[in-house]
Amino acid sequence: MKLLLLALPMLVLLPQVIPAYSGEKKCWNRSGHCRKQCKDGEAVKDTCKNLRACCVPSNEDHRRVPTTSPTPLSDSTPGIIDDILTVRFTTDYFEVSSKKDMIEESEAGRGTETSLPNVHHSS
């Protein structure tokens, strides 16, 4: 059992320590790999963490693809999407009562209990 408890953290930490064990990290829009030295037929396109090079196969034309493109808002025309995105406000009504009101209501519902007697203090 102790051996299992020692082996489990080692298996969890192994991919963190040894990069080859967990596989090389992807870079350059997932077309390259982070390595210390590029292999034959690969070109350095960028730098990765820990002073590694982003190695991309040089036989293909790799260009950075923009991740987002601006969407013009002025050219949009109202349509079915506007009907879907319309938010309708509704009002919910809640009845708020205090603890005192709740106690009075519960005492009135019991009917069998008597109220506490008045206590007079003499000075």
UniProtKB/Swiss-Prot annotation:
Domain of life: Eukaryota
Compositionally biased tracts (Polar residues): 112-123
Positions of the UniProt region annotated as Disordered: 100-123
One Gene Ontology MF term: membrane destabilizing activity
Keyword Cytoplasm: no
PTM comment: The three-dimensional structure formed by the three intramolecular disulfide bridges is indispensable for antimicrobial activity.
Signal peptide stretch: 1-19
Paired cysteines (S-S): C27-C54, C34-C48, C38-C55
Basic and acidic residues: bias regions: 100-110
Any one of the GO CC terms: extracellular region
Localization terms from the record: Secreted
InterPro entries found in the cross-reference section: Beta-defensin, Beta_defensin_dom
Keywords (A to Z) from UniProt: Antibiotic, Antimicrobial, Cleavage on pair of basic residues, Defensin, Disulfide bond, Secreted, Signal
GO biological process: antimicrobial humoral immune response mediated by antimicrobial peptide; defense response to Gram-negative bacterium; defense response to Gram-positive bacterium; innate immune response; killing of cells of another organism; negative regulation of cell adhesion; negative regulation of lipopolysaccharide-mediated signaling pathway
Propeptide part(s) removed at maturation, as residue ranges: 65-123
Pfam families (UniProt xref): Defensin_beta_2
Family affiliation: Belongs to the beta-defensin family.
Role summary: Host defense peptide that exhibits antimicrobial activity against both Gram-negative bacteria, such as E.coli and S.typhimurium, and Gram-positive bacteria, such as S.aureus and B.subtilis. Inhibits cell adhesion of E.coli on intestinal epithelial enterocytes. Causes rapid permeabilization of both the outer and inner membrane of E.coli, leading to morphological alterations on the bacterial surface. Binds to bacterial lipopolysaccharides (LPS) with high affinity, and may thereby be involved in immunoregulation through LPS neutralization.
Official protein name in the record: Defensin beta 118
Organism, scientific name: Gorilla gorilla gorilla
Gene this chain is encoded by: DEFB118
